[in-house]
Curated annotation (Swiss-Prot):
Keyword NADP: no
Subunit structure as annotated in this protein's UniProt entry: Part of the 30S ribosomal subunit.
PANTHER family in the record: 40S RIBOSOMAL PROTEIN S11 FAMILY MEMBER, SMALL RIBOSOMAL SUBUNIT PROTEIN US17M
Name of the featured protein: Small ribosomal subunit protein uS17
GO BP term, example: translation
GO CC list: cytosolic small ribosomal subunit
Similarity comment text for this entry: Belongs to the universal ribosomal protein uS17 family.
Role played: One of the primary rRNA binding proteins, it binds specifically to the 5'-end of 16S ribosomal RNA.
Keywords: Ribonucleoprotein, Ribosomal protein, RNA-binding, rRNA-binding
Pfam families, A to Z: Ribosomal_S17
Listed GO MF terms: rRNA binding; structural constituent of ribosome
InterPro entries the record matches: NA-bd_OB-fold, Ribosomal_uS17, Ribosomal_uS17_bact/chlr, Ribosomal_uS17_CS
Amino acid sequence: MAYKRVIQGKVVKKSGDKTVSLLVERKVVHPKYHKIVKRFKKYLVHDEHNKAKVGDIVTAVECRPISKRKSFRLKEIVQAGVE
């Protein structure tokens, strides 16, 4: 069985039926200035039962491509956010 990436981030948008937009933050060291900087990336995540709401912290796991940009599915809601 292949290794599946697990990402954790904040739901920033309900992108449509069964889809949420997830903002994932990572910290990297700048190559020249050696300062820790934040980098952000948005992922589209498949939410089969429309459980996630804007502001929630969720975990998503990689799966087969569901659409052109959507290849993660919702695993669990870690923390419910305040709308």
